[in-house]
Amino acid sequence: MIRLSDIEWKIRYERESSNLDFKREQYKKEKYESLIKDIMSMANNPVDGSKHIIVGVKETPDGNKEIFPIEPTDFVDVATYQQIVRENIEPTIDFNYYPYDIPEGKIGVFEITGISNHPYMMKKDYGNKLKKGECYIR
C-alpha cells in the first residue's frame, strides 16, 4: 500500500492521468459496469508501476479537487469489489481497495499492482454495455 503522504500528494498536486483517476463516490451496484471498465482500463494501461483510483475526490476542469468524504459505515468492503471483477474479467487482476483518513475525512483508494498478464478482457457480458471479449485501456 502507498503511504498517506503519497495519497495526499496525488490529491493536491497531480491531475488525472493514465495511471490516476478520481471518483466522487464509491461504486454502488448500479455502477458496477463503471467499476469493471475502470479497473480493466487501468490494468491494461502499459505504464509501469501502480495505478490508483481515489474515491471521494472530484477533479474540477481547472484541476482543483473537491473532497466528498465517505462515511465509515458506508465503506464498501474490498471483497465485494474483488468478486465483481474476478467474475467478469480475465485473467485475474490484483488490486486492493482500502480506506484512508485525510484531514477532510475518509476516502477510498484502489491500488492496482502486479500487472503483467495483458490483455485483460471481459469474461462474459455484463449489463447492457459490456460484452464478452471486449477490452478497455486508459
Where are these regions (language model features)?
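Conserved N-terminal catalytic/coupling substructures associated with nucleotide/phosphate chemistry
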Residues: M1-R138
